[in-house]
Regions:
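N-terminal hydrophobic/helix-forming segments and targeting peptides
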Residues: 1-165
Length: 165
């Protein structure tokens, strides 16, 4: 195996691990701690900044030729803004989440006590066979919802899962 393949495999595996950690803006502590731990394993000193970022000095010999790399560790997300009468969820965006490019995406809902539920983000009336306005309907957070992969049909059903506003 070539060195470049070895690094490519490592980078791919680490990227997958990092992307599996829920990290919407303001909720990045877990991913920051993971990144810091991985840098420590590689022998680097990593520190968390006041704002929750990770700062790593990779060393070098000539500071006049220093390079700085800056990257985001947060992801786009949403926050529950309403539990609808049928138990489905309305969300508001966190970060640059846009309703136009999130339709039919899988979502993970994290409760305050750490339980995780999955679902899908979709148009309120997602049946193209019944909804005559499906194709023309403007996608916005006001007309889209999270349909949970759970047997819920009321607000109370959803609240019993630990999901709330």
């Amino acid at each position: 195996m070539k060195i470049s393949e070895k690094y490519a495999d490592y980078i791919l595996e680490e990227t997958k691990k990092i992307l599996e950690i829920d990290s919407p803006s303001g909720y990045t502590k877990n991913v920051a701690e993971y990144v810091m731990e991985e840098y420590h394993k590689l022998g680097y000193k990593a520190d968390m900044t006041v704002k929750g970022g990770v700062l790593v000095d990779l060393g070098g010999e000539d500071e006049s030729n220093a390079v700085m790399l800056d990257t985001h560790i947060d992801t786009l997300g949403g926050m529950v803004s309403e539990i609808k009468a049928d138990g489905n969820l309305r969300i508001v965006p966190i970060g640059g989440l846009n309703a136009n490019n999130t339709e039919a995406e899988n979502v993970r809902v994290v409760t305050r006590d750490g339980k995780i539920y999955t679902g899908v983000f979709q148009l309120d009336n997602a049946s193209v066979h019944v909804n005559k306005e499906y194709s023309e309907k403007k996608r916005s957070f006001a007309c889209m919802e999270v349909l949970l992969d759970e047997m819920v049909s009321t607000k109370d059903d959803t609240r019993k899962l630990g999901i709330d506003v």
